[in-house]
Amino acid sequence: MRILAINIQNFRKLLQCHIDFSKKITLFVGANNSGKTSAMDALGKFLADRRFTFNDITISKRSDINQIGDRWIQEECEEPVDLAEWESFVPKMDMWLDISRNEIHYVSGIIPTLKWRGGELGVRLAFLPKDISKLFLEYREAYFAARKTEKAKEKVEIRLYPKNLCEFLEKNFNTYFSIKTFILDPAKAEADEPQSTPFEMECFTDNPLKGIIKVDMIDAQRGFADPDNADGTERTKKQLSEQMRSYYDKHLDPEKSPSPEDLDILQATEEARKAFDRNLAIKFEPAIHELEGLGYPGIADPKLTIATKMSTSETLKHDAAVQYALSKSDDSLKLSEKYNGLGYQNLISMVFDLMRFRDDWMREGKAKQAKQGSDWAIEPLHLVLVEEPEAHLHVQVQQVFIRKAYDVLTNHKFIKENENFATQLVISTHSSHVARETNFADLRYFKRLSEGSESTIATSKVINLSDVFGKEDETDKFVTRYLQSTHCDLFFADAVILVEGSAENMLLPHFIRNKYPKVYQRYISILSINGRHSHRLNPLIEKLCIPTLVIADMDSAEKEGHHKAACPERGKGLISGNYTIAQWLVKEKDLDRLLAIPSAKKEIIKETPYKYSIRVAYQTPVTIDYDGTVKEAIASTFEDCLVYTNYQLFKEISTDDTGSLVKR
């Protein structure tokens, strides 16, 4: 069993968003504010019972909700009886599962038809009104009461709560709304548009996926802070000592369902308790005698005694339960975990969380005896969500974590021996180093849509990169190797500049920094292709829909034969040997025509919902004053064009004996 895909609607920036899941690891990448966190939160709220807020509704839907409220306050408005009109406004998530024949018993309560024999299975979880009639009546009551109060005193311009239905729901969202689950039609699983909610069918008010999917989540805000900060509540929650206490209580505590191996420690604890009681009796004896001198206890009063209760778990309930030894030769040199580096704290905390998630899922240790009835059964699918694991970690540790995280989650004998019990790991990241360690097919790119593309506000779409370059052809191999070894930061940029040589790669950042301050403030990625390979990235650029500038060399060549390189001249019948210019963007080989093409025709504007453009720049004629004679110079490479354009500057530069440039 595994999750094939989810479809999120009306949840924050994700107005309508389809996300395919990989079999093992799925990585969410994209620029800031592109919806990655929204997708993670949607999974947590729909599947892990996290609390919804009114702001989870896509903000462009508020006017539609207020229109419902405006109708409800009309005197002649009838009480609503169905939820259909809310379908287009509320957060929804469709989940599609792949179920094999021998796993049907797990999903027997949500099969679509009696003829269904496995395969795709879909459910829709929608955050809908619990009781539409109750919401209608209580909103009207609150609204009319507020308006009546406003009229009670003249010359009062204040508008009392609730001004509209959105304001009413903002304070009472979870009171009136809850998750309802519907079974979807597998025959429509591949449809481009999500299917309508089958309101005519009975819905589930309890989570039908409970017992099928176990969901665990590591949030981005993990609470690491200054160890001396007075406000350490969040930090304390994620200290390793606290995590170990929780793990001990659930899986190792010998007082819970004791086994023969636990008897020794229980006996030692009992002997320690008795010794402590005897010591306390001696220490408190003077105080008790003093009380007796005041007449207590009397003849009929119970005698005062001191007794202790000792528990093995209590020994871990302090901040220094986990310490770090600073010297191999001196055991006394130790510090509490809170003084360890933030990076190591984060790494250890995340790895321990993954281990705990796995052992909780497998009902390891004492958890096996603690679970009763249906709770004891192990869910066939474990979904783990990790948000921004790169915090405080340097590059190498980020890469180690992403390589090993899935192995930690599946490092259990039962999981390895039973293929029907699967783990899927979903990670969101801003780190190009994390993206670099992940298979290209596992990346899901979150693309921001500008206002007006599909809504009155900025929204996001998710782009599946699994089949961008086809299946294992030479272009696929080249681009995958290239991006993984150099420039995964492309997935986090607002725009990209492709350059073909090392000179462009070195000089372009300098030009931008010193001459184009507005461009310098943007998130722009400069990719050096190291050759005439820019066109190979065309499928990726079109998939990402990212604004692109390609700086290409003219590479003038002879038209006939093997297209031998030639010095660029007009009227010689030469062509451009650069595929990017001749075949991809300009689609013109003739050198004379290329030199005459205006700038506007060097830009391709893609009229898609994303609306982006690709612009090519190559060498154009430069007029120079050469020893008093004005001449036209045509360059074939970036370096030549740089010299021609700055001819007077280079004339004033010479070299010294060491080869360094000096100005005359």
What is each PLM-predicted segment?
Residues S38, I104-Y106, L135-F136, P208, ...:
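Short helix/loop capping segments that flank catalytic or ligand/cofactor-binding pockets
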Residues T58-E255, S259-L263, G470-E474, C567-I604:
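Glycine-rich phosphate-binding loops of NTPases
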Residues A220-V386, D407, K413-K416:
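Extended helical coiled-coil dimerization/tether regions that scaffold
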Residues M1-A48, K317, Q323-D473, K477-T486, ...:
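Switch/communication elements of ASCE P-loop NTPase nucleotide-binding domains
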Residues R51-R62, K447:
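Short beta-strand-centered segment that lines the nucleotide-binding/catalytic pocket of NTP-utilizing
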Residues D216-I218, P380-E388, Q424-T429, S525-I529, ...:
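Extended hydrophobic secondary-structure segments that form protein cores and membrane-embedded regions
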Residues R448-R664:
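Acidic, divalent-metal-binding catalytic cores of TOPRIM
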